[in-house]
Amino acid sequence: MKTLLLTLVVVTIVCLDLGNSLKCYSSRTETMTCPEGEDKCEKYAAGLMHGSFFFIYTCTSKCHEGAYNVCCSTDLCNKSSTSG
């Protein structure tokens, strides 16, 4: 009986967590849960004057293209320097 109850609790938690639960970095240290419709994490380079740039970390539905950009679809994957 305890096993059945535990199984039902686990299934309920898993089912409740299936919706929009992708987590991405929103800065170098902060994270966020992505809103509905945004199913990718991204880190992309935004240009400044004189050839310098900084990185923007966010959730997205369509990633930017670029040599330094990361586009991926697993939790907290947009901090690394490789795509996933």
Swiss-Prot record:
Homodimer; non-covalently linked. Is able to form a tetramer of dimers in the presence of 2 zinc ions. Belongs to the three-finger toxin family. Short-chain subfamily. Postsynaptic neurotoxin that produces potent, and completely reversible, postsynaptic neuromuscular blockade, as well as broad spectrum inhibition of human muscle and neuronal nicotinic acetylcholine receptors (nAChRs). Inhibition is potent or moderate, depending on the receptor (alpha-1-beta-1-delta-epsilon/CHRNA1-CHRNB1-CHRND-CHRNE (IC(50)=2.56 uM), alpha-4-beta-2/CHRNA4-CHRNB2 (IC(50)=1.8 uM), alpha-7/CHRNA7 (IC(50)=7 uM), and alpha-3-beta-2/CHRNA3-CHRNB2 (IC(50)=12.6 uM)). Acts as a competitive antagonist of ACh. It comes from Micrurus fulvius (Eastern coral snake). Expressed by the venom gland. Negative results: weakly inhibits human alpha-4-beta-4/CHRNA4-CHRNB4 and has no activity on human alpha-9-alpha-10/CHRNA9-CHRNA10 and human alpha-3-beta-4/CHRNA3-CHRNB4 nAChRs. Keywords: Acetylcholine receptor inhibiting toxin, Disulfide bond, Metal-binding, Neurotoxin, Postsynaptic neurotoxin, Secreted, Signal, Toxin, Zinc. This is Three-finger toxin 3b. Residues 1-21 form the signal peptide. It is found in: Secreted. Zn(2+) binds at residue 50. One of its GO terms (cellular component) is extracellular region. The record marks 58, 61, 64 as: Contributes to dimerization. It comes from the Eukaryota.
